[in-house]
Amino acid sequence: CPNLVFINDQPILLYCPQGLSKDVLDYGNIYPNMYKIGQSFDINNAALINPSPIQNLDFGFDCYATQAFNAPDGRALAVSWLGLPDVEYPSDRFDHQGVFSLVKELTLKDGKLYQYPVPAIKDLQAASQPFTSLSESKNSYELELNLAADTEHEIVLFADKDGKGLRINFDLKAGQVTVDRSQ
């Protein structure tokens, strides 16, 4: 599933190199999402000129097969597949496995590729449609966080009396969000 997009005239090759040795680059997914940034692209030989080293696009363990394209306005947009075919999920018993991610806009900054949900996602949140045939869940909500730059934070969801639950860590210095389901 290789994809080539351009950001500010720089070619970005996105791909999932199955079987890549972790000696080349450490990753936590059996089908890693990777990318290289080229200085330019040789269309006659289908080659990146002066490519960067291979880099992780996504550190998630269930995310792969990113599909990207340049929109008519020039933005580089992408969606990724969430859920791996070789992994069993609780939803398998309902004949459902996997889903596409939100549409993301890709940007370059200091030689790294960044992914941000497209702003149009907010337009979808404005309208609500109640489903009267569904039972209400007390574990569903939307949480908007405003965190100061260069800080670290943790929230724990669905915690039991011992504080064990789904831990979400925000490291704004490193630009990483970590989800820990081990407790």
Stretches found by the model and what they are:
Residues Y31-Q183:
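Beta-rich accessory regions
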Residues I7-N8, L20-D42:
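Acidic, glycine-rich loop-and-beta core segments that form the ion-binding/anion-interacting portion
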Residues C1-V5, Q10-D23, A76-L82, D86:
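Hydrophobic core segments of beta-strands in well-ordered, beta-rich domains
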